[in-house]
Structure formats: C-alpha cells, structure tokens
Amino acid sequence: MADNNTLNITNSLEYECVEPIKKINDQADVNEWVNTEAFRRLMKFIELSNESVINRKISDPCLVSEFVQRIINMLDTMLSWIDEIPPLPTPQRFGNKAFRTWIARLEENSVKLHQDMLPEHLHGTIVELVAYFNGGFGNSTRIDYGSGHELSFVAWLCCLSLIGVIKQEDYTAVILKIFTKYLDLVRRLQRVYMLEPAGSHGVWGLDDHQFLSYYWGSAQLKEVQYWAKVNSGLLKMYIADVLKKFPIVQHFLFGSLLPFKAANQGG
C-alpha cells in the first residue's frame, strides 16, 4: 500500500485480474479469511469510509467527481429497469419471480455498464468488478437479499478504490451519494419484488437486509454524546455477525484485488 490513508494499489504492486472464485467452504476457512489481505483491504475501506462521514448529513454539500456521478447514473439506470419490469400479478408465496428477469437484465448489461464507466486502460479489471457488482443486489434463485449482498456491493466499491478510480477525496460522496442511491435501489427491489431476507436473525438482528447503513449512519451522529461508542460497537457487531458468519461469507469471492492470502501487515 502506498500509505495508510489510501487503498490505491495500482502504483505499489503488480496485479493480474482473474475471475473471482469462492474460497470459504467451512468454518476453518472463515477463521483463515479474517487474516487475509482481502479482509484487511475491505476493513480499511469500510473504516476510511466511516471516517469520511463523521458529523456529515446526507444533505450536506460534498465533492461529486465525474466518476462518482457515473456510478450514480448507472444506479439510476438500474432503478428505471424496475419500472420496465413490473412484478408478476399472479400470487406467489416466496418473492416475485419478475425479480429473476431484473437480475437477468443486470447480468446481460453489467459488462457494458462497466465499459462505459471505466477508462479503457482499466477494462482488464472488469472481470473482477462485475463479479462483486452482480452479487450486490440479491439472489435470483432464492429471490432474496441480505447483508451478504450488501457486502458484495461494498467489495465492488473497495475494488474501485483499489484500482484508483475512487480516490480518498471521493469517500464522503461514496457514502452520502453512491451508497445512499444503492439503498434506494435495493429497498425498492425488496418492496416491488417482495424479496425474502437472506439469513434473517429475527428479533435478535439489527436488520434483515442491511447493516453498514447503520454503521456509517452512526458515524454521522458520532459527535453526539455516546454515539462514538455506538459507532465502534456497530463495527465490532458487523465483524462478529456478518464477516465471521459462515452462512454469509461462504458466498464471498476472491480474486487479485481482494486475494485470499495472508495479510500484508505492513500495508
């Protein structure tokens, strides 16, 4: 890593993008995962993002770079697909099968969306980026959505930071603009297609679908008395209840940007 305040790896190491694959097959792999370079990079992105929104309102003005705006436009396009793919009118017990059509459109268009968004010299990274992006909106087989899908989307944002297109000065907009738009999209998907919660904790859980929205949201209140403790506690809870839970992270993918290898402690 170039320094302690950035995730850009393009100038500090060579990488060759590959199609990401599953590596977590049992609890022993979960124990190994928390000591990997992928975990370290992801946690660094999550924590730097948290720092960028301390005491910031969603309505506060912030820098919106051209690239950040491209991502927002891409998510707006995907929102419009919901209007074009209405839910099926026939009664369905578990979710609406029209969601499968929406996911199919995402998978058909994902590469082109990334080609339009990225500069040409970074098109080689698309093979990794689309794997995380496509996994960020729910499962078409089970017609569900949960914190594992949220994790996949955040991993996509992390990868964009790793290749240098999201810069440190963009982090505030990444949360206040991009992630907020993402929440608008996935919450509408949940409502329109009646997505089942993936891995619900019931009354013992914070939320059936999201988690990081609460962590980053608590950072926005961090200067209010006691909320700093809430913020740090939510990060510990996220690690314990999401990142260390096999049913969730068994689906996580690893490539060259988020590698399943021992963490570089000096980075």
Predicted features, each with a name:
Residues 171-187:
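Short secondary-structure subsegments characteristic of cysteine-rich extracellular domains
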Residues 158-163, 219:
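Short glycine/serine- and small hydrophobic-enriched flexible loop segments
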Residues 162-173:
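Inter-helical turn/loop segments and adjacent helix faces that build the functional surface
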Residues 142, 165-166, 194:
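Short, flexible helix-adjacent loops and helix caps
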Residues 183-209, 222:
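Charged/polar, low-hydrophobicity segments characteristic of intrinsically disordered regions
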Residues 1-135, 140-145, 149-153, 176-180, ...:
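N-terminal leader regions that mediate targeting or early regulatory function
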